[in-house]
């Protein structure tokens, strides 16, 4: 929310003046969820830049079509998936520049998506990200292999020189050395910068500690017993045990949300107030959310609700619509592109009858969107990556926001949610020393004893 998109648009306008005779186009690759947002921002701030979208069934597909397509100073917007499919078409082209939005999407060096982007040629390359390190330091090496190949050495050299000393031993000298190498290539803004903080209103972060219902406790304990039996089983090797850890983690998160999330049952229709109340009372988390939404609606404000589970989002949407008789929007990975634009426009609308609540899946809606009409943000279930959570919050808390923003994070007490929340506070300090990061896969790397302590109810 600190102007990365506008920075790039300004840059594209700037280079058009001293270099009017550039013969080809600039390529911008972004997630599908923000494709229309890029188009809209370019039309708004740079209407004289020729902008086209290369995406969908009607896009060009033959090399013979490239000549008329690659116009001077044209901005071509496309997605990661489209580039992966069309790399043979674009690999021979040398673009003015290749710009990758949410560059952490190419963090996995072995993925087809990353391999395709690496093959693109441009006079310059840029990457945009709020979370360049999401899980492991090696992701930074992959991103720099795209931006400045060779700067950080080979994978093996980088691992020996930086990854092992920093991730295993938190070696301060290695952290400082790495910062010295990469900082000249990073333009970084933070909300604490003096010239930015004056443009932002206050942000209040509140943790809401919730208890499990009796039904949830029973399900939780049964699941924990399963994993304890597995971890104590001498016949199963360590790799299999660790593989099951993240699977159980997802189960426990779902139980903390609502008992129905753990079952194969569909969310009921909730046809009358009695059914709604009975269903809501099965989860103190859902009950508390409903109460807080009442405050939002009373003040005639708007709210964002983030969850990582599609079934949870569907449940929240249905409960709130039936409880309050309002239109609740739901933005997730399965929403078609044309409808995504409608959802954002509807939420951002200032008309009295516009939708006041927007539920978003963390993966599809946690980056790139401008949702400054929201003044309350709920993290219904926690993502064990503080940087990703912060990115989601920044859909509302960004330049353009004029009202104070309240951020509520639900934490179910005496469960894995509370214990990992405490661990994250300790972990965040190291991640912040390099670039904001810290992720979820570290949980499976904990010792067996530490895991047992985490899972115990």
What residue ranges belong to the model's regions?
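Inter-lobe coupling linker of SF2 helicases/translocases
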Residues: 77-82, 88-91, 151-261, 407, ...
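Walker A/P-loop NTP-binding motif
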Residues: 5-21, 116-121, 146
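A conserved SF2-helicase RecA2
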Residues: 384-393, 397-457
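SF2 helicase motor core recognition
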Residues: 136, 314, 358-375, 385-387, ...
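Conserved P-loop NTPase motor "coupling/switch" region that bridges the ATPase
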Residues: 71-72, 97, 105, 114-196, ...
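A short beta-strand element within the Helicase C-terminal
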Residues: 93-96, 142, 369-382, 405-410
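SF2 helicase/translocase NTPase motor core
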Residues: 13-111, 159-168, 274, 325-353, ...
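Conserved Helicase C-terminal RecA-like lobe
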Residues: 195-216, 221, 236-369, 442-457
